Amino acid sequence: MLRYCLISIFLAFLHSNLFGQIVINEFSASNFDSHQDNYGEYEDWIELYNTSNSDVDLNGWYLTDKPNNPTKWQFPSSFIVSANSVAIIYCSGLDEINGGVAHSNFKITQTKFNEVFVLSDASGSVVDSISVVPAQKSHSRGRDVNGGSTWSLFTTATPNANNTGAMLEYAPMPSFSQTSGYYSGPFDLTLSSTDPNALIYYTTDGSRPDNSANLYTGPFNISSTSVIKAVAYS
C-alpha cells in the first residue's frame, strides 16, 4: 500500500561505483516480517551483487553505515560472493560470519535519515555506496535489475533473488476534501492527488486499502459514521 510520499535524494558523492565488480544491489531498512535470517529473526539487510564472471572473496573488506567511519565493520573471515550472484549481509549487530551467513556489527535505523551504506575493499578504497532512503514496512530499495544502474523501490523485497517488480517511487498521498471530525449532516467527500496519473482506491470501514478496494471515480456521499482510508497508485 502506497500511502505517503518519500523525498528521495541521491547525492552523487554518496553513490559511487568505482570498480564495478561488487555492487550494493538492494537493501531493506524496514524488514519487519518479510525475510528471516539464519536465527529466525527479521533483521534489516543489505544485498551485494557480483557483476563479474569470477568469485570474489570479501575477507578483509569493509562495510559501514557511517561515511565518516568507513572501517566500522570488517569482514572477519572468508565470505564468497559467487560469480554473477548475490549475497546477503544482515545488519544485526552480531559481528560474525557463521556457516557462510554474514552479520555486521551494526544495525540500521532508516528514521535517522543520515545513514549511508559504504562498501570498501581491503585497501580502504570505496567500491560502492548508497544513501539509506526510508521505505514502508518490509519494502526494499534496490537496482531495477541485478547490477543495473537505476535505483528503484520494491514493494515485495527480493533478497537472495533476482531484482524484479521495480517501481519508480511511492505515489503522492491522496488528499481529502473534509477533515476528520463530527458532522451534523451528510456531505460529499472528494479525494484527489497531485499526480494526474494516479489511481485512488479507498475503503469506508477503516480497513487498509489496496488496489482491490473501491476505485475512486468521483465524489461520494457520507451519511453515517465512517472511517475512510485511501491509497494512490501511479
Language-model features: locations:
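Composition- and surface-driven signal marking solvent-exposed, interaction-prone regions
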Residues: 3, 61, 214-217
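Residue-level detector of functional hotspots within protein domains
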Residues: 8, 31-34, 47-49, 127, ...
